């Protein structure tokens, strides 16, 4: 299947041209997905990035056909209308024969969860890109994340799950997985044959910096697809385990082959419990907050709602609404 089958470029605002090759080096390209049901979350992430930097940021917003119009409207009818962006339509047919339906966490099987596997196939001329999940708020200057030094031979930089001593107690209390044992089925021979120790630290693929040319050189997308197909046949990990089916291929392919992000650039687990909280001083220090887990900040209950809501922009169409407890009048 060639590029044109996988992606369709839909352009951004009429006055915003696509980034030319000569300008690409001075731009911070951010890739983020926008699903119809969570479009307001994506816009909060974009708003936080845009508001906290003076860098020239270009947003590549990846969506499915049903959300193209909604996404463009959300930008053009709000304060975001000044951002530079391009909307790309993802064709979910590319996932046929690679992803099995599973009812335990259907949200983790959304086609857009797999966009991160196909980054080099986007019609962009950047050598390096940032990928952000839609349940993220950026409090720091995105160009600091973009300028991280990747080690030679590394196609990406992630935050390791063993990097935050201050969160270990909280992580243990809510049963969050931090090792490969929580993501792969070690009873399966295919997993044993990988030679990955079950207690090796996992990493979170919801925020990363990618070297596109290194990714292509190492054929990362092909490797990821191989493990998706393997799981489709053998069920070597299931969405009942931590991270669903989108995280394990990344963990396998990038095992011991990634640069580590500064922990403050990916403070996570905010969505794993409606009770577990970080200290206010630590959250102020954080450059990026991630509500990974089932308790999202646009729903209720969830923690640290104020840090997310300050970047939320109401949906001009009125379709994306926050879930909040009724207050006594």
Model features per residue range: what roles?
Residues 1-329:
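Glycosyltransferase catalytic domains, chiefly GT-A lineage
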